[in-house]
Structures are given as C-alpha cells and as structure tokens.
Amino acid sequence: MRKGYMTVRSNKCIADHIYQMVLEGEIAEVCGAPGQFLHIKVSDSLTPLLRRPISIADINKAARQVTIIFRKDGEGTRLLSLKQEGDQLDVLGPLGNGFPAESLEQGKTALLVGGGIGVPPLYELSKQLTNRGVHAIHVLGFASAKDVFYEQEFSRFGRVYVATADGTRGSKGFVTDVIENEGLQFDCIMACGPTPMLKALKQRYPDKEVYLSMEERMGCGIGACFACVCHTEESETSYVKVCLDGPVFKAQEVLL
C-alpha cells in the first residue's frame, strides 16, 4: 500500500452515470491482484470528509496507469466525475485482498459474474486469467440497456452474456437465469455485485469453488474504523472487515 498523488489522464462517461477514469502515477507500479481498490480523496476541502473506495478495472504497469470505473451516485462521486485531464488526486492503495487468479490451473474454466458497478474489477481479473491459459466466461447483469458498459471489452477474453432486468439488452432477468438457461459449464465462479446476487450464487452452487467480492460502505479503508464489517459463517459474533480481510472472500466464509 502506498499513499501519493495520481494524475488524471482521462475521464469520460461510458454509460448512464458511469464514468471511466485513467490515473497515472507510482501507485500503479504496485497494483497487481485483480479485485483490489483505491481509496481516493475527491476534494481538497473537508467536504466530503471520507475517501471513496473505487475498484481497479485495469492495470497497465508499463504506462504507470490504472483505470477505474465508478457510478456517479452521491456528492463524492459527483465531484470525481468532474475531474479533468491533468488534475491531481490524493490516492491510497492498492488496498484489500483480490481474487486468487493464480489458483486456477491452465485449461480450467472460470465463470465471472458481475452486477452493475460490480462489473469493473472482473475486467482485470479476466485479463490475468486469460494470460494464464484459463478460459473465461462472462455473465454481466444490468438494470437496463442504458446501464450496460464494457460488453465489447470483455469479449476480447471470452464469451459474454448480458442480462438486463427490463430486457432491453441481452436476456431479460437475472444473471442466474442466464447461467441456467445457457447451461454454462465451469470449474469456478468469481463474482462481484450486489448482495442478493452474491447470495443467489452461493446458494445455487454449494459444490463449486466460489469467490465473492463484497460491496460495503467503507470509512477508513484500512480496517481501523469497523464501518465495513461482515458476519462470517463461523458464529453470530464473528466477523471480517471487508476493506482489510476482503473485499474478496470464499463463499463459505461469509454470511450473506
């Protein structure tokens, strides 16, 4: 983990309220595990006070750049959406434990399941898995056609299936419907998205190796404030800190 300034190289809207930002700086050189995140100070003032956790979508160490994708949903991300090329951002990262891309053997098949703003970290994951000789299948869920992003980008690494709640793009319904209707075969699931989606995957595939990236509100980002705790299967009183112990967990470790 490092703390430093990163320079905004580009910032553009790629879907409804969805922005893609490229950041350049030394922190990119120590990014590696897919699924980690950056903790970004969005303003030089005290408002908003807390940093914003944004997952890393793509890592380019040679260019010292990382790409983040975020949804404009609140004052913090609104301010972030206004950043221009050349602006400097105070960044802490990379933080958290990512997906174990190295755990899958060459020739195995990974099913990558993303929901909404949980889609971005799966892009770097898919890239790394493909480079290791692992086959990737992508199932991406969105509310509507206007919310869909990175469908074409993911197709570079394997098959892509899109589901929308209203049926305006791809299949109508949930990501779990696509998996069953298409009869997808896989060795492992790696997913990021809203809790109901993660819970459904955990319940439907108890015999599969399933890794889940949790979406929780965070305060400090380093495990000190206890704002992002998640209960575990071990007992009602045991918990993990999503920012420090996660955000990626084995499905059987966490209580959803």
Curated annotation (Swiss-Prot):
CDD domains: DHOD_e_trans (cd06218). This is Dihydroorotate dehydrogenase B (NAD(+)), electron transfer subunit. Belongs to the PyrK family. InterPro entries: Cyt_c3_hydrogenase_gsu, Dihydroorotate_DH_ele_sf, Dihydroorotate_DH_Fe-S-bd, Dihydroorotate_DHASE_ETsu, FAD-bd_FR_type, FNR_nucleotide-bd, OxRdtase_FAD/NAD-bd, PyrK_electron_transfer. HAMAP family: DHODB_Fe_S_bind (MF_01211). Keywords: 2Fe-2S, Electron transport, FAD, Flavoprotein, Iron, Iron-sulfur, Metal-binding, Pyrimidine biosynthesis, Transport. Residues 1-101 form the FAD-binding FR-type domain. GO terms for biological process: 'de novo' UMP biosynthetic process. Responsible for channeling the electrons from the oxidation of dihydroorotate from the FMN redox center in the PyrD type B subunit to the ultimate electron acceptor NAD(+). [2Fe-2S] cluster binds at residues 220, 225, 228, 243. GO terms for molecular function: 2 iron, 2 sulfur cluster binding; electron transfer activity; flavin adenine dinucleotide binding; metal ion binding; oxidoreductase activity. FAD binds at residues 52-55, 69-71, 76-77. Its cofactor is [2Fe-2S] cluster; FAD. The keyword Nucleus does not apply. Heterotetramer of 2 PyrK and 2 PyrD type B subunits. Binds 1 [2Fe-2S] cluster per subunit. Binds 1 FAD per subunit. PROSITE patterns: FAD_FR (PS51384). Pathway: Pyrimidine metabolism; UMP biosynthesis via de novo pathway; orotate from (S)-dihydroorotate (NAD(+) route): step 1/1.
